[in-house]
C-alpha cells in the first residue's frame, strides 16, 4: 500500500465471493483486469502457478506500456495447448480420460503439480456424475540428479496419485538401466500407508511408450492421468494412435517444420501427385 501511495505500481489479487480478480494498482488507481477462473491457462483458477504467471505477465506488459484491453486479450486467449506452451500442462481427452502432459521432473515441480491436482480433481468431482475419480501418474527424473532428489520425487508423487507408474528417460546420464526408477519407486513406497497419502500401488515400466500404454490401459472414463514426459512428441504420437485423432505436436520429432504434419507422408503425397512442390520438401544437402 505504501508503495502504491507513493505512486508505485503493483499487480494484486482481490479475493471476492465471486472469484479472484487480478487488479493493477497505480498510485491511487485500481484497475480490474480479469477473473482468474476465466483465464484458460488457470484450469478454472485451480492452477495457482499460472495465476502467478498471469499476474507477472500482466505486470510486465503494463510496465512496458501495453493497454488494459491488450493485456486482457492476451490473458484470455493464452492456453496451455501445445502450440502456445509445448510440454507444459498440455491437456488431451482420450476416450473421456483427462490426460495432462507435462515436463515435470523434480520434487518441487511435482509438489506444485500435485497441489494443482488436488484442487482440479475437487472441482471436477463437483461437476461429474461418474463417481470416484482415480488419479494415475507416470513419473520420472533425470539420471544426473542426486539420489536423495530421486527418492523425494517419488515421496511427493505418492501424496497425490492413487497409482504411480515409474519410467526412465531414454538417456540414462551415467546410470545403469533401472537404477533411477528403483529410487523413485523407493520414495513412493516410503510414504504408502501414511495418513493422507493417496498412493496404493506403484509399478515400474522403464520404456516411456510402454509406460504410457500401461497407464492408459488402467484408466477409466472420468479419471485424471498425468504423464510427465521426456520425449514429448513420441508421447503425443502414442495418444494420437489411441484417439485416432490428430494431436498437436505428435510429428515434431527433431526436424524443423509444422508440428502437426508428418514430413515423410507429405513427401510421398507430393511425389504421387507429381507436384513440383515435392522439391521444396526435400532436405537441402
Task: Please identify what each model-predicted range represents.
Residues 1, 16, 25-27, 140, ...:
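Structured loops at beta-to-helix junctions and adjacent beta-edge loops in soluble globular domains
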Residues 1-12:
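Cys/His-rich short segments
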Residues 53, 57:
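PAPS/PAP-binding and catalytic site of the sulfotransferase fold
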Residues 6-7, 18, 83-85:
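Short, basic and Ser/Thr-rich N-terminal targeting/leader segments
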Residues 33-36, 40-49, 59-69, 73-285:
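ATP-dependent carboxylate-amine ligase
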Residues 12-39, 88:
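Acidic-glycine-rich active-site phosphate/pyrophosphate-binding loop
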